[in-house]
Amino acid sequence: MKISFFSNYFNHHQEALCNAFYQWLNEGFTFIETEPMEEFRSQMGWGRPAPGYVLKSYLSPENEKKAEELAMESDVVIFGTAPEHFIEKRLEANKLIFRYSERPLKEGRIKVLIPRLAKKFYHNHFRNRNKNIHILAASAYCASDYKFLHSYIGKCYKFGYFPEKEGKSFEELAELKNENKPLKILWAGRFLKLKRADLFLSAAAECRKKGYDFTIEMVGSGEEEGHLKSLTEKLSLSDITEYKGFLSPEETRERMERADIFVMTSNFLEGWGSVIYEALSSGCAVIASHAAGATPFLVEDGVTGRIFKSGSRESLISALEALLKEPEKIRELGKKAYDNMQEYWNPDTAAGRIIEMSEYMLENKEKIYEKGPLSKCEYLYNNWFN
């Protein structure tokens, strides 16, 4: 089988999945990078040395031509954020395509009233709704958004982004976490308004007032950093809070491996939320906003983590307090989360299932997975969690 994966650039979100494809297919797999990465993303640690399976289409006319040939000749094309012209001929031939997509309407359904975007939605999606094209959903809200656009109904499959599978055993992770005295709560991400780190600090302050003992570690940088540090002082959290600054993805993962609880507070502007994936894989007890695209796929409330209502201080306090007053639940949730990620939500499983499902589809057969990557998406709306 030959699979070609088109996306704007090769980065740490895709590297492990691509390596898994290469392990399965060897020379049958190619990643086509269609543009150079922006400098600010490279500085954030997103950039990766290009393995031999990466074709940079923008480097030369010859590479561009090769990419166009792969788009037509491959058995399967996975199509992320890339110029649509690469798949025009493939669409006309009705050959198998998986469109790799976050939710298209995360800013709201009003987007369909903007003429430029309405034209784009029609050209890229609605007119192709009956073609041999399926959605790899990098958001639990994908299916409902595309249903609103009358596109890909019944053809959306659970997917996401797949950083490296955790290499340590849960026992090894628990040993690292048990060194924390008191419990350590980690928040990691860019300090942007949409990430709502302020909500976490406010909820943490309330829990501290109630007598719970813990420390806080804040990883990241960004435009809200000054405000958050001032808020930390105002809420009398400075003595238990450490700001680590910007860390690489690998260094952030190391902090997750040592944390007891991980809190993710983003609003609906968060497309996926890879930190949820990484923290669950690291055996943390994760408390996640219901708005993040990854949450409904990866977090089963009370089983593999806790979910709180996005933007609700009271809901977040309740989720935090539930763990702080029963510390034994922290390892219990962390273990179940770790096991779920090891068995289902990892690059090897995701790549293997795409290959297997593609083999079925190419023979006009159906392959059904009950859970995990490539299981069917439900229609989930913003108000699903109360």
Where are these regions (language model features)?
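Short alpha-helical donor nucleotide-sugar binding micro-motif in glycosyltransferases
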Residues: 246-247, 254-259
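Short hydrophobic beta-strand element within catalytic cores of glycosyltransferases
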Residues: 285-289, 299
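Conserved donor-binding/catalytic core segment of Leloir-type glycosyltransferases
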Residues: 175-195, 201-204, 217
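Short beta-strand->alpha-helix junction loop in the catalytic core
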Residues: 141-142, 158-171, 223
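Conserved acidic donor-binding segment of nucleotide-sugar-dependent glycosyltransferases
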Residues: 300-302, 306-313, 322-327
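Nucleotide-activated donor-binding/catalytic signature segment of Leloir-type glycosyltransferases, i.e.
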Residues: 229-247
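Membrane-proximal helix-turn-helix segments that form the acceptor-binding/catalytic region
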Residues: 115-135, 144, 148-149
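Acidic donor-binding loop of glycosyltransferase active sites
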Residues: 257-271, 284
